[in-house]
UniProtKB/Swiss-Prot annotation:
Source organism: Lactococcus lactis subsp. cremoris (strain MG1363)
SS bond list: none
Molecular function per GO: ATP binding; dTMP kinase activity
Protein name: Thymidylate kinase
NCBIfam families hit by this protein: DTMP_kinase (TIGR00041)
Gene: tmk
InterPro entries the record matches: P-loop_NTPase, Thymidylate_kin-like_dom, Thymidylate_kin_CS, Thymidylate_kinase
Length: 211
């Protein structure tokens, strides 16, 4: 496969989605076609699974069911959208991917890293990002952002106790430390302008010949 896979990761409220929208005009100047997408979702059936997973009324979804729903959505998304784009040499930039399952289900839900790594491998046949930008932020600051700016859009995961969100962040920090070659950590507590500038700097430095 000769495409490039970039994933964006971080706790809820870190600003990934906002940053992706901001950087798109600049990265669309890359020599290759850029395909922005997200998980869970990205294709029709995976977006339907997303609705089920994130609906606050679906309180009967337990941790293992949740993990498998994310994996099913990932498989659909990868087969239908990500792999064809990567095979065509495009740049796929995905808002959340395998590391979200490790951080949220592995650490946050206490299912453990081993089982989540295994299921991620099963769902993706071992596909890994070339680069993962990890947007790091203190849990309380991130939750405050969500409640302040998009309280009308909170989903089932956003509504989890702060304790789970803290475990998710600690999980991310452990994952990032384990694979320094793949991850770049970005301080997401800065102003949006600075976070966007840092993100573009990393991308332009890493993919210098692509711009
Ligand atoms: N650097 C920033 N400073 C202050 N507010 C920000 C910053 N970045 C994003 N925000 C705001 O914080 C809120 C959360 O941002 P956003 O939805 O992009 O985060 P996210 O990481 O995609 O979260 P989630 O994973 O929960 O969807 C939004 O209302 C956004 O406007
Ligand atoms: C892919 C994936 C996501 N999650 C969680 C993380 C967020 O709380 C939601 C997705 O909402 P967003 O607004 O698109 O960030 O789902 C998860 O727990 N496990 C995963 O694999």
């Amino acid at each position: 496969m000769n495409g490039i896979l970039i994933s964006l990761e971080g706790p809820d409220g870190a600003g990934k989605t906002t940053v992706l929208q901001e950087i798109l005009p600049e990265i669309q100047k890359m020599k290759r076609e850029v395909v922005p997408t997200r998980e869970p979702g990205g294709v029709r059936v995976a977006e339907e699974i997303r609705q089920i997973i994130l609906d606050p009324k679906n309180t009967e979804i337990d941790s293992k069911t949740e993990l498998m729903l994310f994996a099913a959505a990932r498989r659909l998304h990868m087969q239908e959208k990500m792999l064809p784009a990567l095979r065509a040499g495009k740049v796929v930039i995905v808002d959340r991917f395998i590391d979200s399952s490790v951080a949220y289900q592995g650490y946050g839900r206490d299912l453990g890293v081993e089982v989540v790594d295994w299921l991620n491998y099963f769902a993706t046949d071992g596909l890994k990002p070339d680069l993962t930008l990890y947007f790091d932020i203190d849990t309380d600051v991130a939750l405050e952002r969500i409640m302040k700016n998009r309280a009308d859009e909170v989903n089932r995961l956003d509504l989890e106790r702060a304790e789970m969100h803290r475990k998710v962040r600690e999980g991310y920090l452990e994952i990032v430390a384990k694979e320094p070659g793949r991850f770049v950590k970005i301080d997401a507590s800065q102003s949006l302008e600075k976070v966007v500038a840092d993100t573009l700097e990393v991308l332009k430095k890493r993919f210098v010949s692509e711009f």
